[in-house]
């Protein structure tokens, strides 16, 4: 899974380029998980996809919580607001598309 590195960013660093890169990274992660599921030959392969889904959801939750304890305000940064909106929609999409991998043990 690709992870968006928030640790080194600050409020000023979240610009249109950062948000575009983050969105592309998350979309690539979802596509890679789809490939893992389609190409799975064993239960272990499917378990690997389940682990990737959990890691992606953890990263998305980290962004929604402000990412690594960073102090950022949605009202002051429209780019960050755009990223938050995208992440919320992506979480909904993941919950629907990968439901059987999220809710089954």
Swiss-Prot record:
It comes from the Bacteria. This is SPbeta prophage-derived uncharacterized protein YopN.
């Amino acid at each position: 899974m690709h992870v968006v590195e928030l640790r080194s960013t600050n409020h000023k660093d979240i610009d249109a380029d950062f948000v575009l890169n983050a969105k592309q990274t998350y979309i690539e992660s979802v596509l890679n998980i789809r490939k893992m599921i389609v190409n799975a030959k064993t239960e272990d392969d499917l378990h690997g996809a389940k682990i990737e889904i959990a890691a992606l959801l953890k990263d998305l939750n980290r962004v929604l919580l402000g990412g690594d304890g960073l102090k950022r305000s949605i009202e002051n940064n429209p780019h960050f607001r755009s990223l938050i909106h995208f992440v919320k929609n992506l979480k909904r999409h993941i919950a629907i598309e990968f439901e059987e991998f999220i809710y089954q043990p």
